[in-house]
Curated annotation (Swiss-Prot):
Belongs to the Ap4A hydrolase family. It holds the Pfam family Metallophos. The keyword Secreted does not apply. One of its GO terms (cellular component) is cytoplasm. This is Bis(5'-nucleosyl)-tetraphosphatase, symmetrical. It comes from Shewanella baltica (strain OS155 / ATCC BAA-1091). SUPFAM superfamilies: Metallo-dependent phosphatases (SSF56300).
Amino acid sequence: MAHYFVGDIQGCFAELQKLLAKVDFNPSRDELWAVGDLVARGPDSLATLRFFRSLGDSAKTVLGNHDLHLMALHGKLKRAKPSDNLTEILESPDISASIDWLRQQPLMRELPEHQLIMSHAGVPPQWSLEVLREEAALVSCALNQDDYLEALISQMYSDSAEKWDPSAIGIERLRYCINALTRMRYLYVDGRLDFDCKQPPENCTNPQLKPWFEFASPLRQCHTLVFGHWAALMGNVGDTKLKALDTGCCWGEHLTLWHLEKDQKITQKKLKKS
């Protein structure tokens, strides 16, 4: 059995299929883990989501910011932009089933036998594994309530929850977890989240900012962290304990698959439109 981890697909279904063919992926034998953002921007979000749903227990994904955005669009809480490229999936006959499936997906997953953790954007450096589990579970619980649209999705868009406060309660606590696990790139030196800079570290001109993974973290002492979200990194983080898998396929670059057991990355260039 092989574990394959794939970066942000964002509707690049043809490239995903090319990658899986390269490694002879077999869902009866292997597992496909995705760092989130299955949908948006790319041409085939509907096919991507249907494919992951069809894999059953052979597919393991976490929620990314675009997956949560799809929930907001379906719930009529946001208006879709042309760049979202989600009209087909929103008008599909199985959209409700797709949303229900997404609601069952967590913000983090573990592979304990390999001491591995996966989330979309990373993990706040001040969090222990126990805190990560607890905070992600609170969001999952809220997503599985009947009133999830009103109680969570309608209120999750806020930059106010920018700093971890263990005494926070209610929506502010949930907001920080969603912000950190699906939107994080840079932190200020005091630990606050920055929501503006998307440049790679070598191009960041604000001396107050550091990439989240450059802060000391208790988790990375014994765990590998797999994440996506930050395409500008192009997989370059300079730490063997970090696997950055978003390599900008929807922006014209390539899709990356990481074979855990071989510690090998396989890539597929963005296909040209026929």
